[in-house]
From Swiss-Prot:
The gene is MT-CYB. Belongs to the cytochrome b family. It is a multi-pass membrane protein. This is Cytochrome b. Binds 2 heme b groups non-covalently. Its cofactor is heme b. One of its GO terms (molecular function) is metal ion binding. Gene3D superfamilies: Cytochrome Bc1 Complex, Chain C. It is found in: Mitochondrion inner membrane. Heme 1 (or BL or b562) is low-potential and absorbs at about 562 nm, and heme 2 (or BH or b566) is high-potential and absorbs at about 566 nm. Component of the ubiquinol-cytochrome c reductase complex (complex III or cytochrome b-c1 complex) that is part of the mitochondrial respiratory chain. The b-c1 complex mediates electron transfer from ubiquinol to cytochrome c. Contributes to the generation of a proton gradient across the mitochondrial membrane that is then used for ATP synthesis. The keyword Transport applies. Pfam families: Cytochrom_B_C, Cytochrome_B. It comes from Antigone vipio (White-naped crane).
Length: 380
């Protein structure tokens, strides 16, 4: 019999083992679709980003008008920009659901895969932040000023660090230039990290909703899950196109239609919606250094997930108390997101502080306690 090139060719063999003949647990649900959706998001963002970069000018005097020019005069430039801006929102929706799936089904016990995933999240957040600065509108400028200023909370070297990041004594042309450089570079770094993430995943194989070893019942990825993934792509691309075509500015800030002006501060400086939960946590501590540490902890806490797992069962499928806690955490994150978009005044301050306290309490204290309690309940 002639050798199958798919299985013998050095490059095709790798593709085959990752996407075609990959042994996959037969019972994984739609929650396992988000990994491939993230891949599609990344590809879409890189493609639209490259097309936008071809027409963008990283200069404070020209950045705003170059973006306007792209939307007005470039063939389908408006669509490319709208897809890129709203694609970022979908990227974050997918990654948050992907992380939620990982927490619910105990996927974090694959430590290497989980840790590279958290690094991917941090890189994505950095990419989105520097990208938001590029149109050089009011919120771009003041967002860059406020967030980079947080580095000044670092003891002793803080101020030097901030001025080094700015390339001067305030956010100006050098800042915009380096932010464009970073925004161009980081997605390729994300691609590399994604390959590492997948390499670690394919070492152990996928987890499944029951959290049990599935070696006895695996099926090839293609055609079973490749077909399921295509359905996922359609279900994601449809709302993305709808948003980009009918309501492209729904998730943006109206303030960003005004060119950056260092002499006028917007009444309420806030990041894009997908970073608001961390912003709300940062804001709920009335001390600069404390706020910065809480901001960092809000994401870095994910690294602790494998250490805080105390249950004898891997997933939450058969753990009703942990499920209740998990959905409380999800609701709490929505509250934090909402509070982050509100002005710093009563009652939003106290709501934000309570929600921040709840966030850390659930993850650090209640999850391990409930896990141990459910172990005890197994004996009765």
């Amino acid at each position: 019999m002639a050798p199958n090139i798919r299985k013998s060719h050095p490059l095709l063999k790798m593709m085959n083992n990752s996407l075609i003949d990959l042994p996959t647990p037969s019972n994984i649900s739609d929650w396992w679709n988000f990994g491939s959706l993230l891949g599609i998001c990344l590809a879409t963002q890189i493609l639209t980003g490259l097309l936008l970069a071809a027409h963008y000018t990283a200069d404070t005097t020209l950045a705003f008008s170059s973006v306007a020019h792209t939307c007005r005069n470039v063939q389908h430039g408006w669509l490319i920009r709208n897809l890129h801006a709203n694609g970022a929102s979908f990227f974050f929706i997918c990654i948050y659901l992907h992380i939620g799936r990982g927490l619910y089904y105990g996927s974090y016990l694959y430590k290497e895969t989980w840790n590279t995933g958290v690094i991917l999240l941090l890189t994505l957040m950095a990419t989105a932040f520097v990208g938001y600065v590029l149109p050089w509108g009011q919120m771009s400028f003041w967002g860059a000023t406020v967030i980079t200023n947080l580095f000044s909370a670092v003891p002793y070297i803080g101020q030097t660090l901030v001025e080094w990041a700015w390339g001067g004594f305030s956010v100006d042309n050098p800042t915009l230039t380096r932010f464009f450089t970073l925004h161009f570079l980081l997605p390729f770094m994300i691609m590399g990290l994604t390959l590492i993430h997948l390499t670690f995943l394919h070492e152990s194989g996928s987890n499944n909703p029951l959290g049990i070893v599935s070696n006895c019942d695996k099926i090839p990825f293609h055609p079973y899950f490749s077909l399921k993934d295509i359905l996922g792509f359609m279900l994601m691309l449809f709302p993305l196109m709808t948003l980009a075509l009918f309501s492209p500015n729904l998730l943006g800030d109206p303030e960003n239609f005004t060119p950056a002006n260092p002499l006028v501060t917007p009444p309420h400086i806030k990041p894009e919606w997908y970073l608001l939960f961390a912003y709300a946590i940062r804001r709920s501590i009335p001390n600069k250094l404390g706020g910065v540490l809480a901001l960092a902890a809000s994401v870095l806490i994910l690294f602790l997930a494998p250490l805080l797992h105390k249950s004898k069962q891997r997933t939450m499928t058969f753990r009703p108390f942990s499920q209740l806690l998990f959905w409380t955490l999800a609701a709490n994150l929505l509250i934090l997101t909402w509070v982050g978009s509100q002005p710093v005044e009563h009652p939003f301050i106290i709501i934000g502080q309570l929600a921040s306290l709840t966030y850390f309490t659930i993850l650090l204290i209640l999850f391990p306690i409930i896990g141990a309690l459910e172990n005890k309940m197994l004996n009765y």
